[in-house]
């Protein structure tokens, strides 16, 4: 009996430890935030009912906020992005151009998100009618149906490849429009979320964030190596989650394979140069040391080694 009791206790303890590891440990491998660049959404919807500013700017700002709140992305505010692009004589459209040097683009971000608003509005209809019954009348009920749709493209900044492209749309139906359309504005989050179109828009933004997370999950973060005498640095730091001890493969571009007719870059061949490890991490820069390999050069690529 004593043996059986001990055996049961051991088994129970083992189960508890496994459950605890699953619940609290999870996937605790270190990760790096992807740098997402959000372009202004082009508006091609018929929104004559809406008297506010361009909904494209409003939806782009909503997406920036949602990506930051997810904790998985580093996202530039629009003014900061414009300043960085100006310093490098680039535009947002250049980030999707494979004719622009990859290293120059990768100093700015990993993925570019571009959208075109195809639907942004609501319809109203009456359900039933007024039926007389003595002195009482049953009033018709109004039903509101909002629909918001976006043609979305997620583009790799490094390769200019379109990683995903499709339409994301949401429909919201209610017997209440929420608030007066005259008060509906992207600038007031409370009233925005009360309006039926605002609710549909919020759902679209949430789905866009999920899609970006899904598409970028297996992307390996790539940065640039900076060589200063005998010292080595990476052009990013604590703002994207780099920590001391993280290791990076160092690669050097050997050849671009281009289409003979269109000139489109089909593939880039890299040489493996070595491995570096983060020793000191600051905002915007990480000091690294060589783990293996020699002959590191300025502007070599560094690729995060997933554990």
Regions found by a protein language model. Give the residues of each.
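A structural "domain/chain start" motif
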Residues: 21-95, 106, 114, 128, ...
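N-terminal secretory signal peptides that target proteins for export/translocation
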Residues: 1-4
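Beta-strand/loop-dominated core regions that host nucleotide or nucleotide-derived cofactor-binding catalytic loops
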Residues: 249-307
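A residue-level detector for short acidic-glycine micro-motifs
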Residues: 40, 119, 156, 227, ...
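Exposed loop/turn and edge beta-strand positions of beta-sandwich/beta-sheet ligand-binding modules
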Residues: 32, 111, 148, 228, ...
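Surface-exposed short loop/turn segments
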Residues: 91-162, 243, 254-263, 267-269, ...
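Bacterial N-terminal signal peptides
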Residues: 8-18
